[in-house]
């Protein structure tokens, strides 16, 4: 029972919407799969209404329920993936590179949709991405991982206003600035673990301030802080 409850409370949005949607199933059946497994409805009418409601919430029409994945654009397919996760009314959604396969304009639409839903329902996201500009926009807290190690963690404000680890600093310095004057003077920092002289395995987490922690040795921290 505990495992079943956890499965319904935690849902996933995948990177490639086309690869994770069954091409032989209609959208209604794709979205309702979790409802079917966990017996969340009492009649077919209720099932249909739940699918229609969640489609409306993600900006799709009820008639889209009878279409197949190949009949949608990339952004629409990702909305179907979001609907499939949301229909279970989860407490946590793990979004694994869920916007990386989309065009920039569609990325903004999907992230705005996710934020609106979060504001409305209070659910939590574990948002996995390499685009730090989007991470900054959607996240309250950030964890920076490299080669399987958590290198730096803190609030969004702590990470972006005072990045400490060289890898974090290189990632943030690579973010383009929309201001052309600032962009011309932006210096992207280069980071290569092989030549950095760092040993992630030898480091431990050090508190910088508040909830801001950085992995490194005592000698590393003396150089960085």
Question: Which residues are covered by each model-predicted region?
Answer:
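ABC ATPase NBD coupling module
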Residues: 1-11, 37, 159-163
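Conserved ABC ATPase "signature" region
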Residues: 45-63, 172
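A short, proline-enriched helix->beta-strand linker immediately N-terminal to the Walker B motif
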Residues: 87-91
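Short catalytic/signature loops enriched in Gly
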Residues: 3, 156-224
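Conserved ABC ATPase signature
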Residues: 68-72, 76
């Amino acid at each position: 029972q505990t495992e079943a409850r956890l499965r319904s409370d935690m849902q996933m949005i995948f990177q490639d919407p086309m690869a994770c949607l069954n091409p032989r199933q209609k959208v209604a059946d794709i979205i309702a799969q979790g409802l079917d497994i966990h017996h969340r409805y009492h009649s077919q009418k209720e099932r249909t209404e739940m699918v229609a409601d969640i489609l409306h919430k993600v900006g799709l029409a009820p008639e889209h329920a009878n279409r197949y994945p190949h009949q949608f654009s990339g952004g629409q397919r990702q909305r179907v993936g979001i609907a499939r996760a949301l229909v279970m009314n989860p407490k946590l959604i793990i979004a694994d590179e869920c916007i990386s396969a989309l065009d920039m304009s569609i990325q903004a639409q999907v992230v705005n949709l996710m934020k609106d839903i979060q504001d409305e329902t209070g659910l939590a996201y574990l948002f996995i991405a390499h685009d730090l500009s989007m991470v900054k926009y959607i996240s309250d807290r950030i964890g920076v991982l490299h080669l399987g190690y958590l290198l730096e963690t803190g609030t969004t404000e702590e990470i972006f206003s005072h990045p400490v680890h060289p890898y974090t600093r290189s990632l943030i310095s690579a973010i383009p600035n929309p201001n052309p004057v600032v962009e011309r003077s932006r210096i992207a920092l280069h980071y290569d673990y092989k030549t950095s002289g760092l040993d992630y395995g030898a480091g431990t987490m050090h508190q910088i301030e508040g909830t801001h922690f950085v992995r490194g040795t005592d000698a590393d921290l003396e150089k960085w802080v």
